[in-house]
């Protein structure tokens, strides 16, 4: 007996497209589409869609809808294409044989024994299974490709899916895949921008601030750090080992910056330029205390993290030493470059001053050196962690500057 009498699924398809145009969260889009199918009579109890994403931490993402629990989103750190979980899945079979649709009666067919995931569904009371693959761009989808997605549709109904049920799911698949493709492309774009430029710059680029010279003046606590003896380490270590060492350093330093709400603007070789935007008046005013305190906490965390790794016997960490300079001042946050190649960053005298402050960390044999512009903005309790280094000439800076060191890093 047919379970759904859907003469026309245009309304469902239209609703899916409308959700995509309205930029609804992907969870709402999937939830709405599945609920409409169920309301139309399709005995759907579970739908899952999976696809690869471009992200430094995750290989893939899946969205699972069930009648009982609604929508759940999962991320996969690593998709092992040689592992048994993937190789014994219906999608491996489909991609290997260039099959775009696979239907199996879970409650009847012995074939399901080759697919552990279907045996699991059978134990949970499912009776029918339909898998469909959509390729983007015309070429067949591959396991490594971002150009497509896989879907599976399951029911617990004793009679399984009827012909009109399957027709309904097929008809809904194209608009659903199109809407999800927009979401996937948007997420890949955001992930790439956030990874290579940081969320603040990435957000500004997506908002349209891409013209040369576009920018804003703001006050910020500035951070500049660099790895000591980087040339010697690069010469002494194989390339792969040196890259591993750099990543340990970046995890300690840049990781601490981001945890405190700072923005890593640039990684230049082994140097890190970051800033903590201040709310309120410019550097000439009394504000910026919170930004300065965040920068100091990040510096303390970075050095403490490195010390902890050394105590644990981390061989890469044992070779690492880095100095940090922290300053506060006005900068122009915007982009500059050629007409065809622009770069977002911070520009101004304060950027030079924080770099010169970081230079003094090496000269004075300190881990963290802080300018008086920072110290004047923090609380008296926060100043207790600092020791006065007196006034020093900074290369290229007209007048001597009073500098301080984090006492805990001496």
Task: State the predicted function of each range.
Residues 361-410:
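Cytosolic regulatory/linker segments at or just downstream of nucleotide-handling modules
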Residues 247-261, 282-324, 349-359:
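Alpha-helical scaffold within the catalytic cores of cyclic-nucleotide enzymes
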Residues 22-70, 260:
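Helix-loop-beta substructure at the N-terminus of cytosolic sensory domains
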Residues 136-170:
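Regulatory loop-to-helix N-cap segments in sensory/regulatory domains
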Residues 327-328, 336, 349-376:
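Catalytic/regulatory signature loops of cyclic-dinucleotide turnover enzymes
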Residues 209-297:
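Catalytic NTP-binding/metal-coordinating core of nucleotidyl cyclase/transferase enzymes
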């Amino acid at each position: 007996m047919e379970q759904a009498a859907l003469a026309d699924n245009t309304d469902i398809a239209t609703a899916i497209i409308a959700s995509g145009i309205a930029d609804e969260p992907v969870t709402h889009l999937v939830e709405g589409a599945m609920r409409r199918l169920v309301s139309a009579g399709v005995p759907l109890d579970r739908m899952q869609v999976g696809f690869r994403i471009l992200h430094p931490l995750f290989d893939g993402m899946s969205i699972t809808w069930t009648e009982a629990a609604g929508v759940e989103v999962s991320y996969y750190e690593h998709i092992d294409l040689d592992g048994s979980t993937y190789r014994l899945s219906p999608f491996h079979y489909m991609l290997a044989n260039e099959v775009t649709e696979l239907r199996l009666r879970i409650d009847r067919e012995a074939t399901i024994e080759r697919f552990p995931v279907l045996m699991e569904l059978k134990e949970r009371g499912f009776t029918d299974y339909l898998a469909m693959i959509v390729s983007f761009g015309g070429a067949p989808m591959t396991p490594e490709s971002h150009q497509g997605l896989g879907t599976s549709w399951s029911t617990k109904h004793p009679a399984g899916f009827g012909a009109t049920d399957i027709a309904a799911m097929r008809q809904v698949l194209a608009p659903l895949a199109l809407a999800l493709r927009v979401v996937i492309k948007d997420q890949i774009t955001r992930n790439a921008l956030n990874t290579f430029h940081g969320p603040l710059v990435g957000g500004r680029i997506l908002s349209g601030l891409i013209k040369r010279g576009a920018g804003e003046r703001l006050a910020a606590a500035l951070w500049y750090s660099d790895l000591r003896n980087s040339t010697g380490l690069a010469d002494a270590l194989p390339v792969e080992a040196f890259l591993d060492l750099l990543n340990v350093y970046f995890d300690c330093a840049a990781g601490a910056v981001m945890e405190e709400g700072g923005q890593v603007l640039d990684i230049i070789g082994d140097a890190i330029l970051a800033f903590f935007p201040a709310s309120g008046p410019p550097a000439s005013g009394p504000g910026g205390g919170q930004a300065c305190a965040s920068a100091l906490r990040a510096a303390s965390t970075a050095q403490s993290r490195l010390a902890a790794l050394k105590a644990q016997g981390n061989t890469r960490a044992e070779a690492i030493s880095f100095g940090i300079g922290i300053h506060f001042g006005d900068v122009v946050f915007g982009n500059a470059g050629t007409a065809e190649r622009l770069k977002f960053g911070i520009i101004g005298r304060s950027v030079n001053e924080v770099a010169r402050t970081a230079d003094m960390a090496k000269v004075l044999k300190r881990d963290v050196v802080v300018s008086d512009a920072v110290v004047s903005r923090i609380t008296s309790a926060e100043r207790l962690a600092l020791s006065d280094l007196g006034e020093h000439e900074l290369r290229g800076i007209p007048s001597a500057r009073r500098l301080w060191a984090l006492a805990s890093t001496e």
